[in-house]
Amino acid sequence: MKDCSGINRFLRENPAFSSFELNASKSRCILSLPSGFLFPSGGATIKTEIEQQLENFLGEIRDRYELEGDAIRVDGHTDDVPLSKNARYRNNWELSTLRATTVATLMMEKVGFKPERIAISGYADTRPKTPYLGNDGSRKSGIDLLNARKANRRVELIFTRPAQKERTRRFFPEPNAG
């Protein structure tokens, strides 16, 4: 199991981040940040009132020994509601990608994460965390649908330990063949 205990402890000790969710598997830690916490509805600019909090949080993450050297994928996700014709962005693909880019840029420029560790992806509504269908196969409605949409609007930080060969290459680069 990937060691995510330091992040888990930090989340428990800091109620400001109680809406963040952490899941660990054998090879990675997935930290889910709700879009409602980070961005205004339909926007890709981090809310001014939480930017410093987010920087502090990401600084804590950056300094966790258990994540040292990990590759980090920043994934943006939206709900299944199409953007209006008057929206700032063309569609949920663009919005999800820009949200991931915004968080990754903050991580690199303000918090000091190394760019070579970070990759960015936008998935629109194609990878829901909470399904839009109920147990009986019918589409959710009412509060169940609203809760599914809320859960699916998120940015995920996925920390993965590189394969042994990649870690070795980083410490012992191959000589130039030329």
Predicted features by range, described:
Residues 1-72, 161-178:
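Periplasmic peptidoglycan-binding/tethering modules of Gram-negative envelope proteins
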Residues 38, 44-49, 53-56, 60, ...:
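Periplasmic OmpA-like peptidoglycan-binding domain that tethers envelope proteins to the cell wall
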